[in-house]
Amino acid sequence: MPKKILFTGGGTVGHVTLNLILIPKFIKDGWEVHYIGDKNGIEHTEIEKSGLDVTFHAIATGKLRRYFSWQNLADVFKVALGLLQSLFIVAKLRPQALFSKGGFVSVPPVVAAKLLGKPVFIHESDRSMGLANKIAYKFATTVYTTFEQEDQLSKVKHLGAVTKVFKDANQIPESTQLEAVNEYFSRDLKTLLFIGGSAGAHVFNQFISDHPELKQRYNIINITGDPHLNELSSHLYRVDYVTDLYQPLMAMADLVVTRGGSNTLFELLAMAKLHLIVPLGKEASRGDQLENATYFEKRGYAKQLQEPDLTLHNFDQAMADLFEHQADYEATMLATKEIQSPDFFYDLLRADISSAIKEK
């Protein structure tokens, strides 16, 4: 009988990416892989799109809010139903372990696994834990963190960032699709790549639309999240979504303008790619992107610009400063010790799962 592992995590791409890196490794080693999530969530979309041999189990989900809302009352019942469904799934599958990447959908499966005596492993990407992982921590066997946590927590293992992105440009797959893009770009201009993520692309899209003069100063690549904006014209390439083209576009860019999600930031760090961070503010998030951006700026990896300050004048000043000190930023990024390979983390996770099973 094959070993089984349950994955959970969703709500944003960032809560799914690491799972999609780990899952093929478990499958290759003969594990039977299952995933608990929201059938209407991005986790289901990404699992389906991946084509991986994964059985998806849908549960009811309710959002965890830090503020009063009448929706909280309805969501209490959704979370309770999700917990009952998770208990049934875990009891039926009897997995060796559960791995959670966070997000509100992950809390019921984590609690269910703990109640049924299954080891629970959690990964936290941000500078501080989100509400879901703060709750899940109480039920976890081990929590792996990208950043060193300010609080000394007994279950925490500081790991560093896990990314499959690499620095060596010679290893980056060639893309014939980008040949057409290059025909519209000027070799005399710097190329900027704007990455807004699933929650933050709109501001970048609007900024580029409002300032057509940007195309006179730079080649612009804009990952929009909106197929209605798709365009290829002089010095401008707008595309709604990329998968295989993601890293070739990264390599093509001289500088990346990004939000403050930790997954993207550490990919840029792994590539030693010059970048400007425009983090989501507290009005649009819990403030984790502000913390991530400040951490990167203090380490000398990047420069940050707050969203209310995103004017053409301030943007041009930031570009000038980054390009003027490009060698310093790149040297600092190349010297980092904060990146781990997927194979390293997979081996660590497998060892920790084995240890947890033996201790039962």
From Swiss-Prot:
Signal peptide: none
GO biological process terms on file: carbohydrate metabolic process; cell division; cell wall organization; lipid glycosylation; peptidoglycan biosynthetic process; regulation of cell shape
Places the protein is found: Cell membrane
Pathway participation: Cell wall biogenesis; peptidoglycan biosynthesis
SUPFAM superfamilies: UDP-Glycosyltransferase/glycogen phosphorylase
Pfam families the record matches: Glyco_tran_28_C, Glyco_transf_28
Molecular function terms, GO-annotated: undecaprenyldiphospho-muramoylpentapeptide beta-N-acetylglucosaminyltransferase activity
InterPro entries with a match to the protein in the record: GlcNAc_MurG, Glyco_trans_28_C, GlycoTrans_28_N
Keyword Cell cycle annotated: yes
Catalytic activity: Mur2Ac(oyl-L-Ala-gamma-D-Glu-L-Lys-D-Ala-D-Ala)-di-trans,octa-cis-undecaprenyl diphosphate + UDP-N-acetyl-alpha-D-glucosamine = beta-D-GlcNAc-(1->4)-Mur2Ac(oyl-L-Ala-gamma-D-Glu-L-Lys-D-Ala-D-Ala)-di-trans,octa-cis-undecaprenyl diphosphate + UDP + H(+)
Keywords attached to this entry: Cell cycle, Cell division, Cell membrane, Cell shape, Cell wall biogenesis/degradation, Glycosyltransferase, Membrane, Peptidoglycan synthesis, Transferase
EC id: 2.4.1.227
Membrane topology category: Peripheral membrane protein
Binding site for UDP-N-acetyl-alpha-D-glucosamine: S198, Q289
GO CC terms in record: plasma membrane
Domain of life: Bacteria
HAMAP family listed in its UniProt record: MurG
The protein's role, per its UniProt record: Cell wall formation. Catalyzes the transfer of a GlcNAc subunit on undecaprenyl-pyrophosphoryl-MurNAc-pentapeptide (lipid intermediate I) to form undecaprenyl-pyrophosphoryl-MurNAc-(pentapeptide)GlcNAc (lipid intermediate II).
Family the UniProt entry places it in: Belongs to the glycosyltransferase 28 family. MurG subfamily.
Protein name: UDP-N-acetylglucosamine--N-acetylmuramyl-(pentapeptide) pyrophosphoryl-undecaprenol N-acetylglucosamine transferase
Native source organism of the sequence: Streptococcus pyogenes serotype M6 (strain ATCC BAA-946 / MGAS10394)
Gene that encodes it: murG
